């Protein structure tokens, strides 16, 4: 029997971001919901047929979503808070969008659900909110409709779901006690999943995949019991359906024995990010009779070609224990671009080293064929020989100057003088800012006009001089507007930047860039990460010209805006031939040069965004420092350690949970940190208070990822919440992220309310 191939999930936005465009058109009133549904159906059909044509045996369905799979699961379970139900939309899709984005209109005014990073990826999920009054029941036919839709096209699929354990661990539940065994919530959720399996049994599904990535995290007391309680109630309902328990982003060595003996028909193991531990667990505990191990050998989170020899070795190690091995993607392919087809800007000799989602289907099929081949067939395999050739030679020459510079670093290069308390006093005197200074995070709306002008430059339809004049006019206008509404510290708007990572990559040695390699970040928001191809260094100043120009146009303090080394790496496709630590150190030196040039140009506040610092923190706490923080935090200090005491260093962090690493963040030795907090209900404030956080802080006072405009009173209330926990002298007032993706009609009223709220609070404090 041939080795089975399985894909955990496929990108849903479309090869040319068709889903993004049609949904955003719907939000703007340019097309109706029927057009959205039609485009979605076309994309699903295309993606299923692609996988079928590639020879994939177990093709995913229900991996499609208009916004987010966790949100879909909440709706499936009827976990819809009353505030959204009261909007009384006719279409469930509109309820979904209100939960994701908030809503402000004739039907009411509600904020969006909280949004967090999906484990260690740059994908964001909506956090389900289970109210005490929630009536858990099967509330959607989406999974069954899409299964039948595929079947009508002649494609047999494997429905995919977020598993109940992961859902409950990530959701906001009424109280921790609700997760005790035999409580109503656990039983109700299990009953819905049991009903889902029973329905798929009636529909004739061969396999159903339940994703339980939360199993790769450290276990808290009661976690294993919760898992057992759920699946004890769910699995008896499966009938003839085979259930694949799929895990990814790490290992499940600490629960493998339990999972193995539980009666699952398949267990999916990540052999990229949990390789050694997962293999050791299988070797130690074996594989239960009737259980197939799905070997996750295809990396679903990077774009480099798979090393077939390595993958075959992993499969062979499993086959020493069991003959029942399938080959699979290590995670959903949601996290990689669609296809390398059309990437003509990258030389063919370089492009051959990359595999996007479509190419990974081919890799999966070739690995399966090689798994079944005899040793003689492997020796004569053209596919194996061509693959091995990619790894035999030197892909790119090392830069000796970069290595030499790193070799000369000393401990002193990672320490800024004098101590922060002394710097704060000097900076307050030098900057002369009021109490509760107001600012923004950096970017302002990138209008159609701005994007069109950039496209013209790219196509050669305007000269660089004309483009620069246009950018200067945009900067002039945004400075005037910031001055008019009364912001204290200004920014130049970043109109010259297409993306906070790609822009820097384009001005550094060692990067490659794609034309269409988009991946979903959240909802319709897509990003196009650059590729770290070789050693990194700065060729020329990157931001100095525009920052200096902006400062020359105002008497206010102008922030210089940079992206930090950890974030550049985490939001790029990193190399796999050298460590992340080494790549980050190279980036840190390049950005350090930029910091010093900005300071020399008269920029008094320099913001070094580390939006993605928390994102790649290992999922198990025992790995946090040795495998990440011990080099990530020093890399940030290396960037700014040489500036003058009076130069104020800011940083910014995005959707992350900071509470557990708050002391490490303080150790970055920035002078000010702003961070997204509005969707997290400012829970980080307690951690800041308890840790006696020394860095000045700007917790975001409103959510920029929602189109709704916060009232002045709403922001005032937020400020008072902040002042309950943080010394007023250390508080900054700002939105929770950059404003690039918002419209001007939302941005300026929101900022006017922000400034008015800050002034009102100041006035009360002065009395």
Curated annotation (Swiss-Prot):
Catalytic activity as recorded in UniProt: 5-methyltetrahydropteroyltri-L-glutamate + L-homocysteine = tetrahydropteroyltri-L-glutamate + L-methionine
Pfam families: Meth_synt_1, Meth_synt_2
Keywords: Amino-acid biosynthesis, Metal-binding, Methionine biosynthesis, Methyltransferase, Repeat, Transferase, Zinc
Keyword Flavoprotein attributed: no
Cofactor(s) annotated in UniProt: Zn(2+)
Residues annotated as the enzyme's active site: 705 (proton donor)
Any Gene Ontology biological process: methylation
Binding site for L-homocysteine: 441-443, 494, 609
InterPro entries: Cbl-indep_Met_Synth_N, Cobalamin-indep_Met_synthase, Met_Synth_C/arc, UROD/MetE-like_sf
Binding site for L-methionine: 441-443, 494, 609
Note on cofactor: Binds 1 zinc ion per subunit.
E.C. numbers: 2.1.1.14
Function: Catalyzes the transfer of a methyl group from 5-methyltetrahydrofolate to homocysteine resulting in methionine formation.
Name recorded for this polypeptide: 5-methyltetrahydropteroyltriglutamate--homocysteine methyltransferase
């Amino acid at each position: 029997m041939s080795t089975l191939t399985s894909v955990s999930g496929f990108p849903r936005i479309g090869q040319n971001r068709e889903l993004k465009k049609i949904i955003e058109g719907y939000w703007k009133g340019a097309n109706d919901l029927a057009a959205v549904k039609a485009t979605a159906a076309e994309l699903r059909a295309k993606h299923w047929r692609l996988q079928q044509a590639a020879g994939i045996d177990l093709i995913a369905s229900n991996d499609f979503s208009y916004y987010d799979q966790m949100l879909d699961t909440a709706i499936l379970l009827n976990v819809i808070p009353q505030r959204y139900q009261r909007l009384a939309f006719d279409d469930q899709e509109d309820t979904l969008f209100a939960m994701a984005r908030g809503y402000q209109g004739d039907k009411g005014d509600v904020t969006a659900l909280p949004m967090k990073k999906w484990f260690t990826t740059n994908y964001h999920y909506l956090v389900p909110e289970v109210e005490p009054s929630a009536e858990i029941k099967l509330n959607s036919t989406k999974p069954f409709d899409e299964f039948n839709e595929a079947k009508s096209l002649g494609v047999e699929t494997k429905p995919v779901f977020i598993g109940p354990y992961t859902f409950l661990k990530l959701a906001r539940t009424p109280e921790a006690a609700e997760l005790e065994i035999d409580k109503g919530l656990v039983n109700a959720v299990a009953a819905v999943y049991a009903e889902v399996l029973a329905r798929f049994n009636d529909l004739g599904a061969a396999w159903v995949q339940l994703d339980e990535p939360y199993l790769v995290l450290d276990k808290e007391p009661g976690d294993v019991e919760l898992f057992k309680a759920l699946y004890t109630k769910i699995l008896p309902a499966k009938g003839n359906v085979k259930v694949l328990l799929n895990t990814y982003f790490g290992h499940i060595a600490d629960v493998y024995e339990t999972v193995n003996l539980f009666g699952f028909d398949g267990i999916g193991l990540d052999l990229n990010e949990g390789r050694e531990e997962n293999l050791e667990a299988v070797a130690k505990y074996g594989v239960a009779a009737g259980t197939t191990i799905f070997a996750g050998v295809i990396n679903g989170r990077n774009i480099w070609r798979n090393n077939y020899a390595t993958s075959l070795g992993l499969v062979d190690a499993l086959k020493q224990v069991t003959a029942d091995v399938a080959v699979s993607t290590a995670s959903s392919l949601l996290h990689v671009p669609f296809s390398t087809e059309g990437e003509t800007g990258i030389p063919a000799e370089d492009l051959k080293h990359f595999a996007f989602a479509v190419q990974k289907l081919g890799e999966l099929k070739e690995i399966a064929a090689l798994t079944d081949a005899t040793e003689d067939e492997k020796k004569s395999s053209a596919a194996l020989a061509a693959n091995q050739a990619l790894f035999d030679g030197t892909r790119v020459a090392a830069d000796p100057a970069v290595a030499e510079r790193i070799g000369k670093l000393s401990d002193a290069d990672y320490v800024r003088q004098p101590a922060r308390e002394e710097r704060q006093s000097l900076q307050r005197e030098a900057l002369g800012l009021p109490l509760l200074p107001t600012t923004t995070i950096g970017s302002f709306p990138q209008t159609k006009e701005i994007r069109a002008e950039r496209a013209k430059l790219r196509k050669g339809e305007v000269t660089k001089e004309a483009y620069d004049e246009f950018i200067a006019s945009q900067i002039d206008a945004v400075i005037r507007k910031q001055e008019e509404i009364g912001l204290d510290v200004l920014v130049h708007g970043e109109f010259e930047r297409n993306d906070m990572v790609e822009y820097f990559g384009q001005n550094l040695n060692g990067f490659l860039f794609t034309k269409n390699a988009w991946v979903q970040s959240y909802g319709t928001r897509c990003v196009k990460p650059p590729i770290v191809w070789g050693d990194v260094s700065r060729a020329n100043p990157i931001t100095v010209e525009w920052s200096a120009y902006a400062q020359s146009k105002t008497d206010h303090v102008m922030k210089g805006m940079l992206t930090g080394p950890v974030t550049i790496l985490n939001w790029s496709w990193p190399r796999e031939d050298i460590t992340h630590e080494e790549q980050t150190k190279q980036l840190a030196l390049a950005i350090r040069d930029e910091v010093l040039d900005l300071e020399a140009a008269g920029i008094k506040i320099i913001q070094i965004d580390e939006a993605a610092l928390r994102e790649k923190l290992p999922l198990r706490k025992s790995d946090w420092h040795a495998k990440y923080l011990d080099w990530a935090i020093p890399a940030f200090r290396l960037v700014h350690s040489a500036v003058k005491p009076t130069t104020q260093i800011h940083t910014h962090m995005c959707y992350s949970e900071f509470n557990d690493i708050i002391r490490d963040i303080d150790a970055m030795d920035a002078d000010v940190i702003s961070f997204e907090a509005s969707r997290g209900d400012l829970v980080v404030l307690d951690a800041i208070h308890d840790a006696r956080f020394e860095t000045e802080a700007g917790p975001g006072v409103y959510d920029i990822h929602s189109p709704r405009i916060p009232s002045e009173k709403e922001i005032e209330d937020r400020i008072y919440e902040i002042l309950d926990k943080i010394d007023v002298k250390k508080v900054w007032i700002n939105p929770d992220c950059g404003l690039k993706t918002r419209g001007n009609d939302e941005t300026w009223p929101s900022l006017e309310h922000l400034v008015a709220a800050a002034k009102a609070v100041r006035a009360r404090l002065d009395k």
